């Protein structure tokens, strides 16, 4: 019977499967289920109605057939390729034997068959010698023996019998010189020469034989030399790798001690902190005092503060002042991927410090390895914290002679595990906050010691212009100011060269003009080409040119625009341009704010003598647009205090506990940077009136804010200001004495105040320039301005200026001559038609009632 066929195969389906596979839709691996689903989806007309499982089985069968055909095809291709390679190899071997060429690569690729030919001939001769009759001399055997053992002779001598090489080959070595399929298969019967040395071998090509032997020996020598060179190179590479691994292990085994050259005089603006540090470091110089008293000296110091405030600098200054080696390690360097290796690194670190005592260990960014263990995400973090606690405790167990001081630095002290901050570990915490104006002045004087400045440089004015700047920001400011000074001097030299083109030692612009040609360029291109000319010039400046080079105050002012203080990213707001001159009217409120905030800062001794210790809080209430936020900025600027602006809703967070933590962080930041003003804008969103029904996050935020304002901890030199449009919905507990005890109502301005506001906005009629027919007093007393706030008056002046600009643009468009741009009375009349009051009569009555209720 015929074998049963494998079954019917749909050729159309087979072609579609092949098309799908070649389209790379399936990637590297093929899923039959996905393949069947895609085919049913793409070819829904043909396969859409088929059952899924049956169609999947059919697709799987087709796929197996395609796979087997592909494997067979690949096998055939490999076989053809192998045969072609064998054919090429045979052709190369034939060419080699004909030309006797010496090729190193062929020797490397193919083994030398000489030893195999010799063994075959030797075994054959020995076998023939032992049992000559048992070997049948077939024509093939005779031909093989002839080609392998018979020396090559000319046709004159005839042939040599088969038994002669068998007898002569006893104890002899053979070199086959007869060309065969394989190269180097040349045999010569040396025993013939030994038995009959006088017998000449007819026309043996001695010279060719010797050249072949020499080339064979050279080839083997080259191969040996190549092998030895490769071995030496491999050995050198291995030695280099071993040495690198050993160096890496030696480097990882222990950190190197550093000698610091920084002193306390290099740390400016932290006199109180330095005094505290000096009192704390007595045990490092006089450990016998603590030993005599039987007291364990402090071992750990935690430095915390915003980035750039000088934590690392202070640690190096401590080491430099005590003249002790410092072992600096970044916290992430301790963490390792192997379990237990991080703890081993910590132990080795402390062991190295104890063996080299007295010394200092400085762990930078310590919060990276010491998170709170209850919220740690990995067991490794908990183990590292536990190991660090153990190492800190072991320092107290060692004798008092092991003087080791551990200093940690972090930006987030609240994220550290509480066990690290107890007594005996990091029990001394030093806060480096945002420097105030006096501290900034001393920091600038310290940074500018080596800078070339004019004799009468105003450090006080520069410190006043840099609120919120920390030490790193001031250093960046000095660097930017130096760059501005260099650019200014080089531009000045170029201007001198334009006036005096004969000067050769100045930066030349002739080359630049040659490159530019005569093509007209714009102003920007001229500036770019001028800067490129400065870069291309390589001549150094002379002493005469650099004699007047120094960094002026204007260079610092120009550099202020390119340096963003770190405190601005931390929530501090710099307000260098808002003063009392920018606020019109509100004289009584300015007096109240001066007594509440400015007087305690400027006259602290008098307030302390009267027992006025707790700073007062001020609530600014009133309709929107009356200048509440502007007042807060002016107060902070006039007093020179640090200023934190908090928008009420930005502290609220959807996660439980995060809103309260944000409130705590704001007050902690203000305490670290005291004296400081905290301004809560729209405080009604943060502290709404509590009721019996509410038990949500807003209640917790109000409670947290109440405790921070007037809780168990006194807020020294932290002033609170708040602004709101709805004082009636604020929780009454916020408004009691000790918190926001002073409420100032900033209401709608009367005509006299409106006149002062208009004069302030227009800079007394100079900006924008007012025409002679404009009477600000009449505008301020107009009945249409009754409900206007300060923001409405500013919008009125702006709209009048736009009307004047529109009229001037229409005049120029019609072809008339360009006139003088001024704001006239008719422009204000047009502005009155467009600007409406932001406070309605109903709202005005409500705010008047609020003012009466607050004044009771």
Curated annotation (Swiss-Prot):
Alphabetized Gene3D superfamilies for the sequence: 1.10.10.2010, 1.10.8.60, P-loop containing nucleotide triphosphate hydrolases
Motif Nuclear localization signal, chain ranges: 85-88, 218-232
For the cross-link Glycyl lysine isopeptide (Lys-Gly) (interchain with G-Cter in SUMO2), the position is 208
The name this protein carries in UniProt is Nuclear valosin-containing protein-like
Q: Which GO terms describe its cellular component?
A: membrane; nucleolus; nucleoplasm; nucleus; telomerase holoenzyme complex
Q: What does this protein do?
A: Participates in the assembly of the telomerase holoenzyme and effecting of telomerase activity via its interaction with TERT. Involved in both early and late stages of the pre-rRNA processing pathways. Spatiotemporally regulates 60S ribosomal subunit biogenesis in the nucleolus. Catalyzes the release of specific assembly factors, such as WDR74, from pre-60S ribosomal particles through the ATPase activity.
The annotated regions of Basic and acidic residues compositional bias extend over: 205-218
Q: In which tissues is it expressed?
A: Widely expressed. Highest level of expression in heart, placenta, skeletal muscle, pancreas and retina.
Q: What is the effect of changing residue 176 to A?
A: Impairs the binding of MTREX
- Membership in a protein family: Belongs to the AAA ATPase family.
Acidic residues composition-biased segments: 92-111
InterPro entries, alphabetized = AAA+_ATPase, AAA_ATPase_domain, AAA_lid_3, ATPase_AAA_core, ATPase_AAA_CS, NLV2_N_sf, NVL2_nucleolin-bd, P-loop_NTPase
The record lists the organism as Homo sapiens (Human)
GO biological process terms on file: positive regulation of protein binding; positive regulation of telomere maintenance; regulation of protein localization to nucleolus; ribosomal large subunit biogenesis; ribosome biogenesis; rRNA processing; telomerase holoenzyme complex assembly
Say if the entry is tagged with keyword Disulfide bond. Answer: no
Task: Give the location of motif Nucleolar localization signal in residue numbers.
Answer: 49-52
The Phosphoserine modification is found at 134, 191, 211, 215
